[in-house]
Amino acid sequence: MLHSPKFGTTLANRVLCPPYIKLLAKWAMSLKKTLKASEQGREDIAKNREEWQKFQAKVDAHRLVFLDESGLKTNMTRLYGRARGGERCLDSAPCGHWETVTILSSIRFDGSTESLVFEGAVDRKMFDAYIKEVLAPTLCPGDIVVMDNLSAHKSQKAYDEIRKRQAEVLFLPAYSPDFNPIEKMWSKVKQVLRGIKARTEEELFAATGTALDTITSSDAQGWLDSCGYTTFKS
């Protein structure tokens, strides 16, 4: 039973009736993730997203270089497991002390990445260093570097380094991570890292390299496709 002074008493731990579950299976319905930013419904945001979709329909996906950052920790572990009926599935991970690092990376249509792992959060100085020393040397004339409008990304020095390579910079519409396929790359990278369970910064650095090595051109093309970049199919 679940009790509340405000809402009274209700039954708890009730299980969905089997006929309902069977009906969902019959209709081939499965659990989906549908959450998106409510701000996407704002008129100005919606207009910018519509313009971006027009851009998607005509841009050569081979030219796109997507950029983003993410956090990695030394307490990562698998979130779910399997065990025989009646037995627990147990695991362990640090709960009080762990290390956190940041990874800045790009991804292209062919699955290639240019990545930098470092301590602390992304700031203008670190972003400039990444662009100059890691990303810019790999750019080709006509490339388009796509990133979100994070304050650390607003660097004229970084833009100049990119334009020296005859490439250009484009910012994604606000509240639109669904237009950046690198978000899906992070999901795969972290899935691999949860399996490796690196517990020191040195181990995490090596494990991150291993995770990035699992990314294939097929992965990248699938991620671009799911985000609306389909010109490579024509």
Give the ranges of each region predicted by the language model.
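Short functional hotspots at interaction and active-site rims
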Residues: 1-234
